[in-house]
């Protein structure tokens, strides 16, 4: 049995949540070790613990938070393009920290203008010994990497508008890179039409275990003429 002494919030629900997480991982057909699973649950525990002071999420119930935050982010893993990743508007680290735990070889930068949320991420990844994440407290317009430091993949689940996401993300994208936005419904046709002259757009339907809501990953690749 797992030693749950390091858990502050979910210790009395650990076995139930671990079983749920393992079943979700099996359904998603992703390869995650027992140690990575423990780190995902520790991240969830820290999210709920820090939430009392830092207002990181409106979701306070551990099972609901596991499904709507952790498992929701895990569902994109089979579809993520390879390479260095930037997560814009990461909030408490979603999906960036979740991806980092599961893909320790991938360099990931998580960016948010909210200092408290970045402070939470810094503390959490230090305690979890997640070494492939660089947290940045900045507005996106003030984050301008040099050409050689741009990103192969830019993700976000924070933008309601796909055009706003593209406007923010495209200048930080390396040549040949991919934009991948976590969405509920497929973006409206008029929004897609604005972008289709410059971007190849695909909408991937996601099946998120235990989440009875529509989810899509909208990916965009620059059209080279």
Curated annotation (Swiss-Prot):
Residues that hold S-adenosyl-L-methionine according to the record: 89, 94, 140-141, 157
Catalytic activity reported: guanosine(527) in 16S rRNA + S-adenosyl-L-methionine = N(7)-methylguanosine(527) in 16S rRNA + S-adenosyl-L-homocysteine
Enzyme class: transferase
UniProt subcellular location: Cytoplasm
Entry EC no(s): 2.1.1.170
Pfam families in UniProt: GidB
Superkingdom of origin organism: Bacteria
Single GO term (MF): rRNA (guanine-N7-)-methyltransferase activity
Alphabetical keyword list: Cytoplasm, Methyltransferase, rRNA processing, S-adenosyl-L-methionine, Transferase
Chief subcellular location: cytoplasm
GO cellular component: cytosol
Function: Specifically methylates the N7 position of guanine in position 527 of 16S rRNA.
NCBIfam families, sorted: rsmG_gidB
Entry's family note: Belongs to the methyltransferase superfamily. RNA methyltransferase RsmG family.
Protein's name in the database: Ribosomal RNA small subunit methyltransferase G
Species assigned in the record: Psychrobacter sp. (strain PRwf-1)
